[in-house]
Amino acid sequence: MPLTEFCYIPSVATDAFYTPEEQAIHNRLVKLYTLRMREKDGQNRKWRVSSINRVIKKHKDELVELLRKSLEDNITRELNPDAVTDKTIINLFCSELTRSLGIKTFERSDKIIIVNVFFFEVLNSIIHNGFNYNGEHYIFYSCGAGMIRTKRFMAVREKDYLAVEQTLMCGLTIDSINALGGMNENKLLSYKSLMASATDRIEDFDIDRCIVVDDFEMPVMAESDFIDYTDYSITRKTSETIIAETDGWGMCCKPGFKTQIVRAPWIKGLVSYFDFRGWLKEYCPADDWTVIDIYGKEWKILEDDIQYILTKSMFKLHKFYPSWLCYKSNFKSYGCYFGCCKVEEDYIPKARINYQMLQSLSDMTDNEIERLIAKTADEIDSIGRDYQTTMRLLGATEYNQTKSAMQEALTIYPELFKDVYNRELLKQTKKSLVKQAKGGRLRINGKYLFISPDPVAFCEWLFKGEQFPTGILENGEVYTNQFKDGDELDCLRSPHLYQEHAVRINKRNELTDK
């Protein structure tokens, strides 16, 4: 499964690429930082700290000037081999990128190097000229949204990248993208990083059984907050808003398929299980068993044996391919794969709410707060006393599919929880739960679930051509088999981005369960 298999790669900072002159200044700066820290921890004389700061600023200015000169000289930097040590080796989860490059699970490899950016002059140089390490040339590969936030990027050994470039980009090149009008650089980097997402290959995925159709959009009449950007006043109005119901969502009718987040070259999103072929046979005449893809080609769902229907919003670079057939041809020719990031498991444990969601409940009373924290307080008090709570916190449960040897032993002989090791583990767990509770992570009767649009409404729009389909859910209703029919559910997005708490009624019956 994803996040269980990884490889080992170097992670270095931009100071590992300094020239000898730049390194000399850097070494002096390190000594000055140490001297300043000792002074602050010792006598903390302000005049001495100020004096050290002035010298630090002078050396920083000298270093920046040298970096700028090196950038103007357009040099190709060298990675200092001494900077790659056991301490700088990190874990990188296995992905389609690592598999394409031939990096084996738990293998130490130099084919990929992570660079932490502190000086943008070095970053600029590497982006344009790459760098050399142990006689090999490396080039800038990509950095996703998470890497941009933490000022990191991924570099790949050039000869290895060129061998798999067409596989990673499914036949496209930077030149071919620019020839068709180009695109936003940050978006391109994010989409290239899809291949570095921690995934497992979906070995039985057949691209010939897959199509891409337009997204289902529908006007919705609802209350919205309008912000006046002149004075930032907020006015709540009831108005009509166009909502992309199927944004980043697709469906699969393959028996045994589990709802999962998928990745492929230029494709990302959630694919849910829905037997649309069975629905077609039951609710539509044979004339409606056809669909038009985003390129205008007609597909016969049953005759063409279509099992996956993806939407346009999932296919990020669709405009750079002349047809879906072209993408499929490249996909097969260059040995591309679909990968799975996360699968919705059969057993879904209860979740903990977080401080963001609690902060948006600004009018809670003391009694409501006490009710909200009751389960967390009971859980903490019952550690070591209640059998089920103790076993659950130690991981010795039936639904834990990756038990350690100790957890297996606890399952056979529960009294082992009195062992010194387990008692210490429970003690640290209790401390952690208390700390989490103080930070707003409270145990509640809730679960983290994938959310998808009404697939029946989507099929009514896609196959029947209904512009305002009714589906099987009314306004204010949701469906999940994790709660009872009629339960009032607070549907919250994680991370929580706004004040709203979408309270909905769970609708469960024979039709929705089907």
Regions found by a protein language model. Give the residues of each.
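Conserved small-residue
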Residues: 1-514
